[in-house]
Regions:
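Conserved N-terminal catalytic core of the sugar/cofactor nucleotidyltransferase
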Residues: 2, 9-99, 108-110, 142
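Short, well-ordered turn and helix-capping elements at secondary-structure junctions
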Residues: 47, 63-64, 126-128, 152-156
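Conserved beta-strand termini and adjacent loop/short-helix elements that scaffold enzyme active sites
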Residues: 60-62, 125, 206-208
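Catalytic-core segments of class I nucleotidyltransferases/pyrophosphorylases
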Residues: 92-96, 103, 109-116, 129-134, ...
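A short, conserved acidic/glycine-rich loop-to-beta-strand motif
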Residues: 118-128
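Extracellular disulfide-bonded cysteine-rich modules/repeats
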Residues: 138-140
Length: 226
């Protein structure tokens, strides 16, 4: 990934992000904002405005311009969303956040239906994994109704409170921006989620069955291309 950004890693001769665009379009999401940083031009030059993929794409660069050069500068996943919203309110309805380097076949329509049925402001999609694998992931702890209570980041197997893991797929309502400060680094997992739990906001885990391959993990990538 020194020369190729993760969303551009090829699977069956297509960048992984192209599969995500197809999934989004299939479920009626055609307005897409891509938060770019590392090798941003590789992504923008390939996908452009999204027209040939049946969607509309806009880009937000996570960093600054110095002497005409784009300098990547992480402001966190939530910080990136907030900057987009502060610049021009893009998120005016229920929206979905995906990682650009995961291959999934999630039923997004059903996920959004369940999110709304819960009356959630924020939902995260969880997936059950074999108990001996929990130490590779962030574990989600909920009450019987699915309301998120806490997280364990890569716990030891015997200390894990559950076998439900955070897949990095989120559904939000625009009200979530009330919990994200402007102009400072802020991460969805490390900062926003604990804040939502502390505030008692309607924040739920939605367990779903689907294929999920993390292209950022080398064994998962080999599994995908086979």
């Amino acid at each position: 990934t020194h020369t190729t950004p993760k969303p551009m890693i090829p699977i069956l001769q297509k960048p992984v992000m192209e599969f995500l665009l197809e999934l989004l379009r299939q479920h009626g999401f055609d307005q897409i904002m891509v938060n770019v940083s590392h090798l941003a031009e590789e992504i923008e030059n390939y996908f452009r405005d999204g027209q040939r993929f049946g969607v509309q794409i806009a880009y937000s660069f996570e960093g600054r311009i110095e002497d005409g050069e784009l300098i990547g500068e992480a402001i966190g996943s939530a910080g990136g969303l907030k900057r987009i919203q502060d610049f021009q309110p893009f998120f005016d309805d229920t929206f979905v956040v995906l990682c650009g380097d995961a291959l999934i076949d999630l039923d997004l329509t059903e996920a959004v239906r369940r999110h709304r049925a819960k009356g959630a402001m924020a939902s995260l999609i969880t997936k059950r994994v074999p108990r001996d694998q929990v130490s590779s992931y962030g574990v989600v702890v909920t009450d019987p109704d699915g309301r998120v209570l806490s997280f364990q980041e890569k716990p030891e197997v015997d200390e894990a409170a559950s076998d439900m893991i955070n897949t990095g797929i989120y559904i939000f309502e625009p009200e979530v921006f009330n919990y994200i400060p402007s102009g400072e680094p802020f991460d969805i997992g490390a900062d926003l989620f604990p804040k939502l739990v502390e505030a008692g906001a309607p924040f739920f885990a939605l367990p779903m069955e689907f294929e999920w391959v993390d292209i950022g993990k080398v064994p998962d990538y080999w599994q995908a291309i086979r």
